Amino acid sequence: LLDEIFNSLSLPERNAIQERILNEIKGRMLEDIVLLETKMANPGKQVFVLQFPIGEFDMVVFDPNDAACQIFEIKHSTEMAKYRYRHLIDQEKCAQTEHRYGSITKKTVLYRGENQMVEGIWYQNVEEYLKNLQVTPIAGV
């Protein structure tokens, strides 16, 4: 952030840019932590990011034995907003996912706010989600 153009900006502009960058980094780190912990807690399931030409599901937990999956958005935010779950209610994305991974049994936004249901979407506190995961220790580690 020692760039000439950056330094030519006013203090409020520089602060806003730094805050935006920091929030983006926190969001990506949170996604990585949730994916890793969920994978470790679900050795019989496939846990991955599912990308589409436009947008993605931040996490899919696919159970091949049940031919079913859960889809997630992971947000480093304390606020609920419809745009945060827009991919979870996208009919085309859901149809493609169900065709490939079976029935979608749950749609969840993991975020830093309170647990609640909104329009069929479960908003779950990410800290509670992580605390409730039962991680199986890896033998020999």
Language model features by range: what are they?
Residues 1-57, 63:
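Accessory nucleic acid-recognition modules appended to NTPase machines
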Residues 3-8, 73, 83-84, 119-121, ...:
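Short conserved micro-motifs at the rims of enzyme active sites and ligand-binding pockets
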Residues 34, 38, 59-81, 88:
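Conserved catalytic cores of phosphodiester-cleaving nucleases, focusing on short active-site segments
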Residues 44, 101-104:
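Short, high-confidence coil segments that cap the C-terminus of an alpha-helix
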Residues 48, 70, 106-109:
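A structural signal for isolated positions on well-ordered beta-strands in alpha/beta enzyme cores
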Residues 53-58, 107-111:
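Small/polar glycine-rich anion-binding or flexible loop at a beta-alpha turn
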Residues 77, 82-101:
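Short, charged, amphipathic alpha-helix that recurs within catalytic cores of restriction-modification
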Residues 109-141:
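Domain-level recognition of nuclease-like catalytic cores that cleave nucleotide substrates
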